[in-house]
Amino acid sequence: MGIDHTSKQHKRSGHRTAPKSDNVYLKLLVKLYTFLARRTDAPFNKVVLKALFLSKINRPPVSVSRIARALKQEGAANKTVVVVGTVTDDARIFEFPKTTVAALRFTAGARAKIVKAGGECITLDQLAVRAPKGQNTLILRGPRNSREAVRHFGMGPHKGKAPRILSTGRKFERARGRRRSKGFKV
């Protein structure tokens, strides 16, 4: 009699231990923050390191309007904003507070808006020199679930998820169960 292997014997951990990318600058940042995460007791460095491992989809961009909104919070006005990802411009805002923003990259419009307000744009390795323990910083993340693809995930009855279809219109995906005139409507 043998043993029934009812579950997978070698379970892969879903967590990344290194970035998938071959970007040498990213690898240098990983090396730097691996050292800081090990040698300092600050959880900030561990958070930044884990964020550096993420895929581009899981590192959505942060707009300058989101940064401006975050800085309006109580006690956040003079903190350094940290974004492990891209900082993008927002044409809808004209007033931007003077602040220091550290990020992986900036779009030209976002950089211009931050500098014009009297702030500065720094890289994450410059941040490590200024705040090795992440003191006086504010970490921001972009919206992960704003992608169009997320509308289709978890399809099923009563989930309100969008079906994957090529044609859209009044009668597409609106038959039995979706219209009163076709049997019933949920």
From Swiss-Prot:
It comes from Saccharomyces cerevisiae (strain ATCC 204508 / S288c). This is Large ribosomal subunit protein eL18A. Component of the large ribosomal subunit (LSU). Mature yeast ribosomes consist of a small (40S) and a large (60S) subunit. The 40S small subunit contains 1 molecule of ribosomal RNA (18S rRNA) and 33 different proteins (encoded by 57 genes). The large 60S subunit contains 3 rRNA molecules (25S, 5.8S and 5S rRNA) and 46 different proteins (encoded by 81 genes). eL18 interacts with NAP1. Signal peptide: none annotated. InterPro entries: Ribosomal_eL18, Ribosomal_eL18/eL18-A/B/_CS, Ribosomal_uL15/eL18, Ribosomal_uL15/eL18_sf. It holds the Pfam family Ribosomal_L18. Its main location: cytoplasm. GO terms for cellular component: cytosol; cytosolic large ribosomal subunit. The modification N6,N6,N6-trimethyllysine is found at K50. Belongs to the eukaryotic ribosomal protein eL18 family. Component of the ribosome, a large ribonucleoprotein complex responsible for the synthesis of proteins in the cell. The small ribosomal subunit (SSU) binds messenger RNAs (mRNAs) and translates the encoded message by selecting cognate aminoacyl-transfer RNA (tRNA) molecules. The large subunit (LSU) contains the ribosomal catalytic site termed the peptidyl transferase center (PTC), which catalyzes the formation of peptide bonds, thereby polymerizing the amino acids delivered by tRNAs into a polypeptide chain. It is found in: Cytoplasm. There are 2 genes for eL18 in yeast. Coiled coil: none annotated. GO terms for molecular function: RNA binding; structural constituent of ribosome. There is a cross-link at K116 (Glycyl lysine isopeptide (Lys-Gly) (interchain with G-Cter in ubiquitin)). Keywords: Cytoplasm, Isopeptide bond, Methylation, Ribonucleoprotein, Ribosomal protein, Ubl conjugation. One of its GO terms (biological process) is cytoplasmic translation.
